[in-house]
Amino acid sequence: MNQQLVPAIKVKDLSFYYNTSKAIEGISMDIYRNKVTAIIGPSGCGKSTFIKTLNRISELEGPVKVEGVVDFFGQNIYDPRININRLRRQIGMVFQRPNPFPMSIYENVAYGVRISAKLPQADLDEIVESALKGAALWQEVKDKLNKSALGLSGGQQQRLCIARALAIKPKVLLMDEPCSALDPIATMKVEELIHSLRSELTIAIVTHNMQQATRVSDFTAFFSTDESRIGQMVEFGVTTQIFSNPLDSRTRDYVSGRFG
């Protein structure tokens, strides 16, 4: 392996169940530090479930069972001694639809910081500005920080949610189809943002958009489901190889549009 490729997250034989219903089975892959990894595959193949297992947010959806290991910089996140709140600060999440809180733009970004630390106002102001700049939103909102976040456009709201995640300085950012509800211009801005953030963050993104996966990611994992196995990872590799010369015929059929 290239010495520059350092895994931020190592997934080993991961299976996940909602109650007794299996959602993903036997997933093993690395998510490399300061790289973008795309998770692709047809609907119902476990992409979103998988990404939610990486910071244990899936547990908020009801009784679950986990088998296998998710190693985050040397620690199994499913170790019972893990501090889940600290884990979720280190591995942030951006969801499919923008979910700004019904409060001001400023307070949306400051929210997570206020929960985790009591800071002087000047320090908080600096963090909010830095996060909004990191999300490429500062110039658009700097004169209306006290206005409701609900008045922003859909694309601005999604970048605000990214800023909210950035404010608590995560090491990894998980993105679950972050552009599916956005128009092409807003999508382009989010993709540009992903490119700019990769130098600071490790990013994993679920997407149905094959073109988006080729544009933004360094590595791609293809998930699928068949009659014998549900929620399996068929193939993982460098994005250019996955899309131009996949090793598995199922991957080839999917990326060429023959199914899915």
UniProtKB/Swiss-Prot annotation:
Disulfide bonds: none annotated. It is found in: Cell inner membrane. ATP binds at G41, P42, S43, G44, C45, G46, K47, S48. It comes from the Bacteria. Residues 9-255 form the ABC transporter domain. It is an enzyme of class 7 (translocase). It is a peripheral membrane protein. Signal peptide: none annotated. GO terms for cellular component: plasma membrane. Keywords: ATP-binding, Cell inner membrane, Cell membrane, Membrane, Nucleotide-binding, Phosphate transport, Translocase, Transport. GO terms for molecular function: ATP binding; ATP hydrolysis activity; ATPase-coupled phosphate ion transmembrane transporter activity. SUPFAM superfamilies: P-loop containing nucleoside triphosphate hydrolases (SSF52540). One of its GO terms (biological process) is phosphate ion transmembrane transport. Its EC number is 7.3.2.1. Belongs to the ABC transporter superfamily. Phosphate importer (TC 3.A.1.7) family. Part of the ABC transporter complex PstSACB involved in phosphate import. Responsible for energy coupling to the transport system. The complex is composed of two ATP-binding proteins (PstB), two transmembrane proteins (PstC and PstA) and a solute-binding protein (PstS). This is Phosphate import ATP-binding protein PstB 2.
